[in-house]
A protein has these predicted regions:
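An extended, acidic
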Residues: 73-189
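DPxDG-like acidic metal-binding loop motif
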Residues: 2-55
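Short helix-loop capping/hinge motifs at secondary-structure junctions, enriched
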Residues: 57-60, 65, 172-175
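Short loop segments at secondary-structure junctions
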Residues: 31-35, 45, 54-57, 89, ...
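Detector for glycine-centered tight turns/loop "hinges" at secondary-structure junctions
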Residues: 34, 47, 62-63, 155
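N-terminal subdomain of lithium-sensitive/metallo-dependent phosphomonoesterases centered on the IMPase/IPPase/PAP
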Residues: 1-11, 178, 185-189
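Active-site glycine-rich loop that binds ribose-phosphate moieties when present
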Residues: 28, 67-69
């Protein structure tokens, strides 16, 4: 792989878009040496756009900039909400374990929107098993810029070569990684 590359997902949530569902977007990230350094996630049918560069705060149009900046409570687990974006590829036993912890899995049909919702504080976490950097690079940088935790499903730092991503508030992220650690090998597609 080249040291610096652009990755673009021109229609993230393709099935949603083709069905007239507005939960679809355009994801663009600049990756340098395996890590995203600039990112734009645009959801034109929802009127939302997130923009950031490495070391800069998250900027948002059409929604909150972040749900992570409001002090200790904002960084914790909100039991009343606890929404976690997840893929339809999530094994049923993992889905049920998430529910047993009080988390509430949600499937938007768009990895990029799940990640944007984490960065904006709409979701407390997200999990997906996409091995494609165009699905996760923009969201990884945006969630980190918002103060969230981002890793691969095993809890290692996320890179463009990772097979999936887990992100969220520190507590929700730790809960998801703990659940996945008991299911090693069952979630790679």
């Amino acid at each position: 792989m080249l040291d610096t590359v652009w990755v673009v997902d021109p229609i993230d949530g393709t099935a949603n878009y083709s069905a007239g569902n507005p939960m679809a977007g355009i994801l663009v990230a600049l990756i340098h040496e395996g890590a995203p350094v600039a990112a734009v996630s645009d959801f034109p049918l929802l009127g939302r756009r997130l923009v950031t560069c490495d070391g800069s705060p998250l900027r948002s149009v059409g929604g909150p900039a972040t749900g992570f900046g409001g002090g200790e409570e904002a960084m914790g687990f909100d039991e009343a909400r606890g929404h976690v974006g997840c893929s339809s590829h999530l094994p049923t036993d993992i889905f049920h374990e998430l529910r047993e912890t009080g988390l509430r899995p949600r499937m938007t049909g768009s990895v990029g929107l799940d990640n944007a919702f984490v960065a904006q504080g709409v979701f407390d976490g997200a999990i997906n098993f996409s091995p494609h950097p165009w699905d996760n690079a923009a969201g990884a940088l945006q969630i980190q810029a918002a103060g969230g935790v981002v890793t691969d499903p095993e809890g290692n730092p996320w890179t463009a070569q990772s097979r999936g991503m887990v992100a969220g508030t520190p507590q929700v992220h730790a809960t998801i990684v703990d659940i996945l650690s008991r299911h090693t090998g069952s979630f790679h597609r």
